[in-house]
Every structure is written in C-alpha cells, then in structure tokens.
Amino acid sequence: MARYTRRKILKTAAAASAFTLAAPYVRGAYAAGTLSLGCWDHWVPGANATFTKLCNEWGEKNKVEVKIDYITSQGEKDKLTAAAEAQAGAGHDIMTHRDWNINVHRDKLVPIDDVVNGLIKQYGPISVVAEYLAKIKGNWHGVPTTVGSQVKPCCSRFDLYKEHAGLDLREIFPADEVKWDKAKVDAWTWDAYLASAEKLFKAGFPVGLPMGQSSDAVDWVSALFKSYGVVFMDEKSTIKIDSAETRQAMEMARKIMAVSPPDVYAWDDAGNNRWLISGKGAGIMNPPSAWAVAKKDNPKVAENCWTHPMPKGPKGRFVGQLPIFYGIWAFSKNQSAAKDLLTYVSQKDSARQLVAASSGYDLPSFKAFYDFDTWKTVEPPVGTVYNYPPRGDEQTSMAGYPAPPDVSAQLYNQALPTVMVSKFTQGKEKLDEVIKWAANELEGYQRT
C-alpha cells in the first residue's frame, strides 16, 4: 500500500475509563436511533456481507439502526476519510483504523478500556502487537478487529521446495501442531531459508520478497530484524541501531536479496502476490490472499501452496502482524451503543463467522480463537492455511518495538527497515554508513 505520512504524531492522550465489562456478553437497552460505521472494504467476496449480518442482528435486538459504509484502502481512502472526520469533528460513530492510525487520532477517540479489558477477561491474553498499537499511556483507544487483521508468514510452493531444495514443508509443518517434530521445526532457520532460496533461484523459481516501501516489505524485514535481536530504539528513547545484531541481520538480508528477482525493490503490496500466482515464484511472506486468488486464476499453483511459520533467528521466530482496529470518535452521540456493538462483533462466535467468510484470511488478536475449523478445512489442499495463525514458538512482531509509539509510527510509515536494506544492497552503500544514516533518521523522528 502507499505510505501514509504526516508531519507530526499527535501527542495528547485521552482520559482513562476505569469500568471493566463483565465477562459474558450482555446486550444493553438503547433508545431508538442510529449507529454509523466506516469500515475497511474487504477484498474477499462475501466477507462484508457477514459483518453486515452481525451488525444487523445486534441492531434488531437493540432497536438501533446500523448504517455501514465500506471504504476501500486503495489510495489510502480509508485513512484519508478518518483524517477528514477527525478534523471536522463529524462523521461516523465508529471508524476502522489500520496500523498506527489509532495513535494518530488518539486525542479524538473515546477510551475503551471497558470493552477491551472485558474481552481479555473472557478470552485471555491479547496480541502484544495489538497492545503496542492501541494501548496508549495505559489506556485502550481501539478494539482489535477480526476483519482484515493479518499476519505475514511464509506461503510456499511445497512441490518446488521438495523438488529443488529437498525440503518437505508439509512434513516439517503438518496441519496439526501435535504432529510437529521439534527438531525439524527448530531446523527451519534463516540459514536454512537462505540455503533453500539459493537452490530455488538456481532452479529458476526464486522466492519473492518485496523490498520497497509497502507494508508487506516492512513487515517481513522487521520480522527478520526482530529474530536477530535488532532494536532501533528502546522504550527509554535510547537509539540502539548501531549493533552487532543489526549487522548480522543486514548481512542475511543482503544474501537473500542476491537470490531474489531484481525488481523486488519496486514491488507494491500486490507484487509478491502476482509473483506467486504467476507460477514463477517458490514462495512469499504474506497472508493467504495470493493462494485465494490463485484458486481462480491459477489452480495448479493454489493446489501446491502451503502456509507455514517464518524462519527462526538467534533471538527467536517472529512474524509480522498488522491488526486493524475499531475506534469510537469522541464526537459520537451514541457511544454506549457503539461500545456494545463492538463487544458483540468481537465475541468468539462472531469471529468464527468472520474468519469463515474470509476463507481464513482474517486473524483475530486472541490466541484463544486459533482453534477455528476454517484453518483446518479450507482447500486446496486441505490444511493449506492451518499454520497461518502463529503456532509453536512463532511470535508476532511490529516494526520499531519497543520504541515510543511516536517514533515507531514514523519508522513504519517511512519504511526505515527496507530503506536501510535497499541502500546496502541495491545502492551498494557501506554498511557502517547505512547504520549511521538510520541513527540520524531516528534522531529526527524524536524531534518531530
């Protein structure tokens, strides 16, 4: 997607709400009225209809008319709409916000600790990435959605890996975590990934990892960095990018880029999808969207796709996560009803229906929801996206963590991780100079 930029991240946090919602969902009683939502427009046919159905069910029970506008993310229209509504102080009651947009608009959003803490009480721990993006100065300002939220693990052609790299990915990561062999899983490291990528490159089927300024590029590179222990800036605002860990990760990225298609530096978020669907590529790092499109456009490719965990680095196994959030504008006249609706659509049964409607693309932020049958049953082949939810030792990550959100938002939106790699690999700049440049960029983020 296009990068969303601004001069400054807004600084003011809204006051906290102390009330904690009871564990079970209990509908409220509201005066007749309307509740309007501006929602991310899903790319999966029928997914919007399922969300509309859930909202209408709640509306009929509570005698509230629910109006939904589905807003495309093409050209960042959803973010531009949110920015316009925040400035005008008028618009929808509830708005969806991608990546760092909760932080951007936090002083215009109602604190919703009661909703999120109630869900945590029901379902247990929530994604650390969701907390990093939406819990600001101790208070939740957004509810993680099921709709559109995603992680970006490996999606690989298991036939090509077996033929040309000698790896049976379905044997390493079968569609049943109980059957995983720890020794085989532990052997799936970045060194193993590189060795297989080199063989696939020689065979004429390179992996396709973008290195532009799109979110897909930033997310996979950030997961690589995290697995090597790279820290851009710590929570105390100390710049840490000049480290042995950074140099190790950059060298691995350099080696991977050497066996990648040369045009990956210009790819947008659709580039890696097109690469896999074309049949030319052996693998990407992405949600199962490419597989879903291939089912129609190139069935032979889809039949040989297998989603599985990311490679492991010296500091662990990490996968990029990109949640979407619901936020309630402070100007909303029906905030109580808005909170109740968000609680309803966040229930496990609601999430189950939404995941099914998206063929497993949508990923809730609660690990307690990772047992849905959809990931076990969608095909072809059966089990192809079972490993899409993080399982085993795979942890979610977000670029910039644990730096202060105002810094990480700029780091993400300006694609600092991929620009670093591009300077080093495509630009042939010296590694020390690239790291020095990145440190200067981080200093600049602190001043804005």
Give residue spans per PLM region.
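Extracytoplasmic/periplasmic substrate-recognition and gating elements
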Residues: 32-36, 56, 60-62, 135-138, ...
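Hinge/lid segment of periplasmic solute-binding proteins
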Residues: 98-155, 159-162, 304-311, 379-387, ...
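C-terminal capping/gating helix-and-loop segments adjacent to ligand/active sites or protein-protein/ligand interfaces
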Residues: 65, 381-443
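Short helix-initiation/N-cap motifs at beta->coil->alpha
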Residues: 71-81, 187-192, 264-278
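Conserved N-terminal structural module of periplasmic/extracytoplasmic solute-binding proteins
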Residues: 2-5, 9-107, 116-124, 149-150, ...
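Paired acidic/hydrophobic, glycine-rich loop segments that form the ligand-binding mouth/hinge
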Residues: 93-96, 282-286
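Short, solvent-exposed loop/beta-turn-alpha elements that line the ligand-binding surface or hinge
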Residues: 114-127, 167-186, 228-249, 296-299, ...
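Glycine-centered hinge/linker elements that transmit conformational signals in sensory
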Residues: 190-201, 235-266, 310
